[in-house]
């Protein structure tokens, strides 16, 4: 990223459907240790991205049950850790976001996209496509899109990468409309 002038961000989902301790204090400690490793091992970080996933049905090491975590406590602790170790990083998602989701995974912001909104509650996420000209809170928008049909690598999709022309359109429909652009590059098993 640095070599090509790109800002580096990381994604670590707080939901682990396979970890046997998910939803328990042992897993919270495990997750925060993973966070610390990522926040201290790769240089300056532009963004830490949460997807808001908070449990549900999962295998959880064989338990095959439904679990979740106390999101407010979980994310507030994460925010403190991120601010301590990477104070310049913005946070996306969870209950502690510095930027807002535009509302689609197509990389397209509203034609008018204000960086202000009224309030910050999760119940307002559906109103965040364009922001609000008379908002009272600075919460700029972020568009997210993958260069592939989905967010993860699948060999059968190798021929379905977005074209350069489509990527340029996405740039104009996101950055050109006052939003940050998160462009996902799913990597294969070799990294």
Predicted regions and their residues:
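Mature catalytic domains of secreted/periplasmic carbohydrate-active enzymes
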Residues: 2-191
């Amino acid at each position: 990223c640095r070599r090509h002038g790109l800002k580096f961000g990381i994604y670590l989902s707080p939901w682990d459907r396979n970890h046997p301790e998910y939803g328990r204090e042992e897993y919270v400690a495990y997750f925060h240790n993973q966070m610390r490793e990522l926040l201290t091992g790769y240089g300056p970080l532009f963004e830490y991205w949460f997807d808001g996933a908070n449990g549900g049905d999962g295998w959880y090491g064989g338990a095959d049950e439904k679990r979740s975590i106390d999101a407010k406590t979980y994310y507030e602790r994460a925010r403190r850790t991120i601010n301590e170790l990477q104070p310049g990083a913005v946070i996306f998602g969870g209950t502690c976001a510095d930027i807002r989701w535009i509302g689609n995974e197509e990389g397209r912001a509203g034609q008018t996209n204000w960086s202000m909104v009224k309030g910050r509650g999760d119940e307002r996420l559906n109103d965040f496509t364009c922001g609000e000209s008379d908002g009272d809170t600075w919460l700029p928008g972020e568009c997210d899109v993958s260069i592939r049909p989905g967010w993860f690598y699948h060999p059968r999709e190798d021929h379905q990468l977005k074209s350069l022309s489509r990527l340029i359109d996405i740039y104009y429909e996101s950055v050109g409309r006052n939003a940050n652009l998160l462009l996902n590059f799913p990597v294969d098993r070799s990294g």
